[in-house]
Structures are given as structure tokens and as C-alpha cells.
Amino acid sequence: MLSALRTAGALSTRRLASTQAIASNSEAPKGIATTGTPFLNPSSKAEYALARLDDVMNLAQRGSIWPLTFGLACCAVEMMHFAAPRYDMDRYGVVFRASPRQADLIFVAGTVTNKMAPALRRIYDQMPEAKWVISMGSCANGGGYYHYAYSVLRGCDRVIPVDIYVPGCPPTAEALLYGVLQLQKKIKRKREAQLWYRR
């Protein structure tokens, strides 16, 4: 028993020593603590500052997502459930906007027809930059039940770029909430300032 404790103590001491050696050999600038972010390149103070700037910008963007509702069919009812008190989208910073010029996210919910496709593209183009799209339901994802109809667009991704697909017919409000949380994770990984610096 005593020898097992000594062996375990020796192993933990070796691990601690190797961790300290790795930390001392890293090329982090003096006075700057590494935080474990995947975008940190400690070779430059400017890159460190831009990584922190990206973190702050991403925190602000993912904490205040303003979606535009583009409800075309029965999936829009589940989008309304998402706004109701049971799921309380406001606690995630999601507030519906009525104008595309004030929105940074669009929920495409329902069947997109060929005649509606130009309007969808026009609305998407009116949104300011840093814009995202959540395609909600099988009809918006790929045509769904009406896939082979002559007047149906087989997925809104043929007209606008889609960031998150929420499956279901219709998807539940929990599924839409999960899609919003996945979008927040995607926003958290953005690194615009660092890419600008490296150009």
C-alpha cells in the first residue's frame, strides 16, 4: 500500500515537472498569461491583443442575436412557440426584429417556392454584415414533402448561404433553441480581427 502511494506520488511529481518545463519553454511574451484560447499565437503581442478583441466582439455578437422571421408555413408556429414564455428566447439575447436592416439572423421556416426565392434573396441582401441563416424544417432544408412539386425550391441553400440546418417536420421549439445555441458556438469561434491582421 505504501509503495503504491509512493509510486503515485512520483508519477504526479513527474507530470508536474514536465508541465512546468513545457510552460517555461513556451514562447509567451513576458507579462501575458496564456488563457487556452485556440486562436492564441503567443509569438506576438499584437496577435494576442487581436485574439482578445475577437473574444470580446464574439461575446457581444452571440449575446445579442436579432433574428428576422421569414415564416412561410407551419414551421413558423414552432418559431412562435420559441418566442413564448416556456422557452423564453429573450434570455439568450434573441429578440425578433421586423426589418431586415436591423436583423443579423434570418429564420427561414417553411416551404420556399420559386416565386418567393427572389424575395428571400433580396431580404438577405438587405441585412447588414455579420449575418447568419438558420434553415428550419424539412421544407426549407430540402423541399420536404413537396420536394418534387414543380413550384418548390429544393432547399433555401440554393438561394442564400445557410449556417445551421434544423431538421424536422415541423421541428420543435427545443430543436430551434438547439440550433440557436449551435449558432452561438459558431459565432464564438469567429476570428475576424486576426484574419485581418494576417492579410
Curated annotation (Swiss-Prot):
Molecular-function GO term, any one: quinone binding
Binding residue positions for [4Fe-4S] cluster: 74-75, 139, 169
Any matching Pfam family: Oxidored_q6
Cellular localisation: Mitochondrion
Cofactor mode of binding and number, as noted: Binds 1 [4Fe-4S] cluster.
The protein's Enzyme Commission number: 7.1.1.2
CC cofactor: [4Fe-4S] cluster
GO cellular component labels: mitochondrion; respiratory chain complex I
Keywords: 4Fe-4S, Electron transport, Iron, Iron-sulfur, Metal-binding, Mitochondrion, NAD, Oxidoreductase, Respiratory chain, Transit peptide, Translocase, Transport, Ubiquinone
GO biological process: aerobic respiration; electron transport coupled proton transport; mitochondrial respiratory chain complex I assembly
Domain of life per record: Eukaryota
UniProt-listed PANTHER family: NADH DEHYDROGENASE, NADH DEHYDROGENASE [UBIQUINONE] IRON-SULFUR PROTEIN 7, MITOCHONDRIAL
NCBIfam families, A to Z: nuoB_fam (TIGR01957), PRK06411.1 (NF005012)
Subunit architecture: Complex I is composed of 45 different subunits This is a component of the iron-sulfur (IP) fragment of the enzyme.
Family: Belongs to the complex I 20 kDa subunit family.
Name of the protein this chain belongs to: Probable NADH dehydrogenase [ubiquinone] iron-sulfur protein 7, mitochondrial
